[in-house]
């Protein structure tokens, strides 16, 4: 039961973490592109 709960939490956090990293990288890219006039 505990293993299933942990696996569910991990599987739920992985996409959120990847999405957060992607959004952060995108925002930094946009900010750098705007500052590089």
UniProtKB/Swiss-Prot annotation:
It comes from the Eukaryota. The chain crosses the membrane at residues 5-25. GO terms for molecular function: electron transporter, transferring electrons within cytochrome b6/f complex of photosystem II activity. It is found in: Plastid, Chloroplast thylakoid membrane. It is a single-pass membrane protein. Its main location: plastid. One of its GO terms (cellular component) is cytochrome b6f complex. Keywords: Chloroplast, Electron transport, Membrane, Photosynthesis, Plastid, Thylakoid, Transmembrane, Transmembrane helix, Transport. Coiled coil: none annotated. Pfam families: PetG. One of its GO terms (biological process) is cytochrome complex assembly. The 4 large subunits of the cytochrome b6-f complex are cytochrome b6, subunit IV (17 kDa polypeptide, PetD), cytochrome f and the Rieske protein, while the 4 small subunits are PetG, PetL, PetM and PetN. The complex functions as a dimer. Component of the cytochrome b6-f complex, which mediates electron transfer between photosystem II (PSII) and photosystem I (PSI), cyclic electron flow around PSI, and state transitions. PetG is required for either the stability or assembly of the cytochrome b6-f complex. Belongs to the PetG family. This is Cytochrome b6-f complex subunit 5. It comes from Marchantia polymorpha (Common liverwort). The lineage of its organism: Eukaryota, Viridiplantae, Streptophyta, Embryophyta, Marchantiophyta.
